[in-house]
């Protein structure tokens, strides 16, 4: 079993969100922020989620305040912002650190599987993305500049793969 499925972050309500419930799904994990130039990506992320959720795809957002202090709100405020401004219905987790001594185990795992540009492991900014296949393998890592809508073809390919 992939180490991915042993992870269990905490959701915005403080409840465990065990990743073993994601077995057989294609998962896009994104570190998100409410006051970032990339925040409008929420709209494309939600469109991707709605398009593929019934085919075995999900998105998980991890709010993070490590880049320019662009996610200052409480978990409840963040969830409200996402819902009111972008109609977000995909799961949003509790605010975490994605780098440094307090980095969340989810990001420690993801970064150990796929390094970023120039082989660097650290998350560079908000809205960096990790695409995980149906077997829990980190398939690809995308920079903040990558538009969520550009991932459709890859998501479709991964959804077609037999487990």
Curated annotation (Swiss-Prot):
Alphabetical list of InterPro entries matching this protein: Glutathione_peroxidase (IPR000889), GPX_AS (IPR029759), GPX_CS (IPR029760), Thioredoxin-like_sf (IPR036249), Thioredoxin_domain (IPR013766)
Localization, UniProt: Cytoplasm; Mitochondrion intermembrane space; Peroxisome matrix
Recorded phenotype for the gene knockout or disruption: Sensitive to hydrogen peroxide and tert-butyl hydroperoxide (t-BHP).
MF GO annotations: glutathione peroxidase activity; phospholipid-hydroperoxide glutathione peroxidase activity; thioredoxin-dependent peroxiredoxin activity
Biological process, per Gene Ontology: cellular response to oxidative stress
Record-linked Pfam families: GSHPx
EC number: 1.11.1.24
GO cellular component, one term: mitochondrial intermembrane space
Cystine bridges: 36-82
Cited PROSITE patterns: GLUTATHIONE_PEROXID_1, GLUTATHIONE_PEROXID_2, GLUTATHIONE_PEROXID_3
Family: Belongs to the glutathione peroxidase family.
Note: Present with 8000 molecules/cell in log phase SD medium. The active site is a conserved redox-active cysteine residue, the peroxidatic cysteine (C(P)), which makes the nucleophilic attack on the peroxide substrate. The peroxide oxidizes the C(P)-SH to cysteine sulfenic acid (C(P)-SOH), which then reacts with another cysteine residue, the resolving cysteine (C(R)), to form a disulfide bridge. The disulfide is subsequently reduced by an appropriate electron donor to complete the catalytic cycle. In this atypical 2-Cys peroxiredoxin, C(R) is present in the same subunit to form an intramolecular disulfide.
Known partners and oligomeric status: Interacts with YAP1 and probably YBP1.
The protein's name in its UniProt record: Glutathione peroxidase-like peroxiredoxin HYR1
Lineage: Eukaryota, Fungi, Dikarya, Ascomycota, Saccharomycotina
């Amino acid at each position: 079993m992939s180490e991915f499925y042993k992870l269990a972050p905490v959701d915005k309500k403080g409840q465990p969100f065990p990743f073993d419930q994601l077995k057989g799904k294609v998962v896009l994990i994104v570190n998100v922020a409410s006051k970032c130039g990339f925040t409008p990506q929420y709209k494309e992320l939600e469109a991707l989620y709605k398009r593929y959720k019934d085919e075995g795809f999900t998105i998980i957002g991890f709010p993070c305040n490590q880049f320019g202090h662009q996610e200052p709100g409480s978990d409840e405020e963040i969830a409200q912002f996402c819902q009111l401004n972008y109609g977000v219905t995909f799961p949003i987790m509790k605010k975490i650190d994605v780098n440094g001594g307090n980095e969340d185990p989810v990001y420690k795992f993801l970064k150990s599987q796929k390094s970023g540009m120039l082989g660097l492991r650290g998350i560079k900014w908000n809205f960096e993305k990790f695409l995980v296949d149906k077997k829990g393998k980190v398939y690809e890592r995308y920079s903040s500049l990558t538009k969520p809508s550009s991932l459709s073809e890859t998501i479709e390919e991964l959804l077609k793969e037999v487990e």
